[in-house]
């Protein structure tokens, strides 16, 4: 096993992903499970691997991810940001392409809290004028 490793941390909603890239054949593990088995959806898998595809590093790195919190969609977003940040440690040349694709921006959208007197964050009972 190689000593060279690149780390990246990604967060999305309430998910947090610690990503480690090592030179290898393209193995992708999430929480010690094969990524396809963990995410269970090709759409989420494609979303998580987007930075690798954009930087054209498909079969060059083994990816190990430890992700916690949230649902699968939030976890896939956190993994995507973590991989993008780890790729920046590999080479700064990837920055331009990743930045224009929006891979380096932390998605700050989170669920709005429920307010007292309302049914949900903004949903209120029907208003009657008369």
Curated annotation (Swiss-Prot):
Heme recorded as keyword: no
TM regions (residue ranges): none
Molecular function in Gene Ontology: RNA binding; structural constituent of ribosome
GO annotations of cellular component type: cytosolic small ribosomal subunit
UniProt region (Disordered), positions on chain: 109-130
Comp. bias intervals (Basic residues): 111-130
UniProt-listed GO biological process terms: translation
InterPro entries: Ribosomal_Su5_D2-typ_SF, Ribosomal_uS9, Ribosomal_uS9_bac/plastid, Ribosomal_uS9_CS, Ribsml_uS5_D2-typ_fold_subgr
UniProt xrefs under SUPFAM superfamilies: Ribosomal protein S5 domain 2-like
Record bears the keyword Ribonucleoprotein: yes
Keywords annotated in UniProt: Ribonucleoprotein, Ribosomal protein
Similarity comment text for this entry: Belongs to the universal ribosomal protein uS9 family.
HAMAP family for this protein: Ribosomal_uS9_B (MF_00532_B)
Protein name: Small ribosomal subunit protein uS9
């Amino acid at each position: 096993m190689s000593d060279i490793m690149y780390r990246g941390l990604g967060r999305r909603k309430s998910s947090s992903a610690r990503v480690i890239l090592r030179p290898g054949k393209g193995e992708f593990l999430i929480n010690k499970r094969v990524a396809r088995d963990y995410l269970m959806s090709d759409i989420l898998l494609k979303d998580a691997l987007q930075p690798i595809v954009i930087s054209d590093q498909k079969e060059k790195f083994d990816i190990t991810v430890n992700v916690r919190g949230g649902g699968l969609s939030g976890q896939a977003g956190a993994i995507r940001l973590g991989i993008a940040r780890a790729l920046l440690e590999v080479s700064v040349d990837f920055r331009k392409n990743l930045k224009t694709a929006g891979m380096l921006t932390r998605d700050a959208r989170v669920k709005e809290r429920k307010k007292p007197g309302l049914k949900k964050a903004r949903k209120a009972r029907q208003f009657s004028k008369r």
